[in-house]
């Protein structure tokens, strides 16, 4: 009897040690299912006259779309320093690799940019294959490098018969993503056909927008509406060089598209004010779509990772290292990446975003509720010729606005700032996870500032993941009920595989937990790559047994 008891005690002790010593990882190991992608477009543009001093920075004659198309080559994609080999080594399994403008045969006169016929002069290793086999083999090669798969850029209005052929080719080749950068919004042939024969194909549509939101040159406003605003239907010129549409569509058309596609991209924005411009576009859409499941598309907001994490959106990330300078007036000229923010050095933000979406999947535009603060923040700065290709802004003060606080399916966070306030966003996801982010500001004398505030996040639950992005003076989690005495607070850099017990480093009160901003900075950047300046991104969980 004593022997049996002794054995039992040993077993219990061993089990206890095993549990105690077990490494807790708050981030799933399995790649996410969200349709995010990294896109070649910014890097293509940066390769024009690579490494050469700039004598003429004109985007209309030198650094043009046709010139960028010529950089879409086998060497630039698959070479030793090729994009598919360099980008996102840690999380490319969560991203499609989208080959952008220039991969198709440019000698085909009809619907030149919607043929799915690869240019074999640029990609000679696929020349001996028939067209549908080429994209299949490139998809195989992209996946072999660890990516989720190959995505295709297209633009145009093929006939219904042609569109069926292209969907069939994609099914044959295992292509799961089309970036439709204009077109197919009259009859939605692609949507109708893929729903019938290849529903796995994710379609992205646009209606277009200018690089900045409307009334940008008018001083003294507190609201600068986007083309998606229901208060004013703004019409702006599209990107220079666009041959499909010369103006954007009205808001009614945009809303129709969101009902008829899988992904709606809010479109490009000028780099210095990109976050403010994009936040306004998100607001102008969600205020009309939230709560109506007919709006089934997910919103893709380009390259604002922390905003997308906090609001349950998709990204089309395009940032990349800038290691072949094109110097002009003391700056490395890049019309798509500019300013003191240096997103080229914030590559880990892409990783942390993807890892968060393994925990909390994005939400359609029509899902749940949307709230926003009555107060808007306005950012402004004078654009120079090195900041953007958009010539009407050169030497002029550009102003953009967005709500100070935005929230989906959760109460608005409370924000207290002594001086300049950051933008604050938060969401609660269907699985109970919550995300919150702060975003920086742009002032006339500074193209990027990251102010800190005291933020209170409401409706927090025990044993549910909380994603925290950005910088804070403090972040207080409000649970709304007495906190059990046996809780343990774990936090983990999303790039790490090990959570840390921070219970003794936070302030626990009756119904709240206050986290110092310095602790968020420490934990959330713990795994930053060398020379990476990404904002903090971490996951926290309050565990109660």
Predicted regions and their residues:
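Aromatic-lined carbohydrate-binding/catalytic grooves of carbohydrate-active enzymes
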Residues: 38-188
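C-terminal (or distal) subdomains of carbohydrate-active enzymes
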Residues: 8-11, 461
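Sec-dependent signal peptide recognition
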Residues: 2-8
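C-terminal motif of bacterial Sec signal peptides marking the signal peptidase cleavage site
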Residues: 15-16
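Short boundary motifs at domain starts and secondary-structure transition points
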Residues: 23-31
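Short, aromatic- and glycine-rich surface loops/edge beta-strands on solvent-exposed regions
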Residues: 537-544
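Active-site-proximal substrate-binding groove within the catalytic cores of carbohydrate-active enzymes
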Residues: 30, 36-39, 46-63, 155, ...
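Beta-rich carbohydrate-recognition modules and glycan-binding surfaces
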Residues: 1-2, 178
């Amino acid at each position: 009897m004593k022997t049996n008891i002794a054995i039992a005690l040993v077993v219990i002790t061993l089990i206890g040690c095993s549990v105690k010593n077990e490494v807790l990882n708050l981030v799933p190991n399995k790649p996410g299912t969200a349709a995010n992608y990294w896109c070649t477009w910014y890097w293509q543009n940066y390769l024009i006259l690579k490494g050469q001093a700039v004598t003429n920075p004109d985007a209309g004659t030198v650094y043009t779309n046709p010139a960028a198309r010529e950089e879409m080559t086998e060497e630039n994609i698959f070479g030793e320093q090729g994009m598919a080999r360099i980008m996102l080594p840690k999380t490319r399994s969560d991203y499609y690799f989208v080959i952008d403008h220039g991969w198709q045969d440019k000698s085909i006169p009809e619907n030149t940019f919607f043929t799915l016929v690869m240019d074999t002069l640029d990609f000679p290793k696929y020349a001996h294959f028939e067209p549908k086999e080429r994209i299949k083999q490139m998809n195989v090669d992209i996946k072999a490098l660890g990516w989720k798969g190959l995505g295709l850029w297209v633009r145009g209005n093929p006939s219904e018969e042609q569109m069926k052929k292209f969907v069939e080719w994609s099914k044959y080749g295992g292509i799961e993503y089309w970036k439709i950068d204009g077109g197919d919004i009259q009859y939605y042939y692609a949507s109708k056909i893929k729903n019938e024969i290849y529903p796995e194909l994710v379609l992205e549509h646009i209606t277009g927008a200018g690089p900045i939101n409307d009334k940008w040159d008018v001083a003294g406003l507190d609201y600068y509406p986007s083309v998606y605003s229901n208060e004013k239907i703004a019409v702006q010129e599209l990107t220079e060089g666009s041959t499909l549409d010369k103006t954007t569509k009205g808001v009614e058309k945009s809303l129709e598209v969101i009902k008829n596609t899988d992904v709606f991209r809010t479109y490009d924005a000028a780099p210095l004010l990109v976050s403010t411009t994009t936040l306004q576009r998100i607001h102008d859409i969600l205020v009309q779509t939230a709560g109506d499941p007919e709006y089934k598309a997910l919103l893709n907001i380009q390259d604002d990772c922390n905003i997308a994490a906090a609001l349950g959106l998709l990204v089309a990330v395009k940032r990349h290292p800038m290691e072949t300078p094109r110097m002009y007036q003391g700056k490395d000229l890049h019309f798509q990446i500019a300013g003191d923010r240096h997103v080229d050095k914030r590559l880990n933000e892409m990783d942390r975003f993807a890892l968060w979406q393994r925990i909390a999947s994005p939400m359609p535009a029509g899902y749940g509720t949307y709230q926003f603060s009555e107060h808007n923040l306005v950012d402004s700065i004078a654009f120079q010729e090195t900041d953007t290709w958009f010539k009407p802004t050169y030497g002029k003060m550009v102003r953009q606005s967005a709500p100070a606080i935005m929230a989906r399916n959760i109460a608005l966070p409370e924000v207290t700032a002594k001086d300049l306030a950051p933008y604050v966003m938060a969401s609660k996801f269907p699985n109970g996870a919550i995300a919150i982010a702060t975003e920086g500001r742009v002032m006339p004398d500074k193209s990027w500032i990251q102010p800190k505030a005291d933020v209170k996040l409401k409706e927090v639950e025990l044993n549910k993941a909380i994603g925290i992005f950005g910088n804070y003076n403090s972040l207080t989690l409000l649970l709304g009920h007495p906190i059990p005495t046996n809780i343990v607070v774990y936090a983990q850099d999303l790039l790490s595989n090990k959570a840390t017990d921070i219970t003794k480093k936070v302030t626990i009160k009756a119904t709240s937990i206050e986290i110092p901003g310095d602790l968020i900075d420490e934990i959330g950047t713990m795994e930053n790559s060398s020379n990476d300046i990404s904002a903090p991104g971490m996951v926290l969980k309050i565990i109660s047994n």
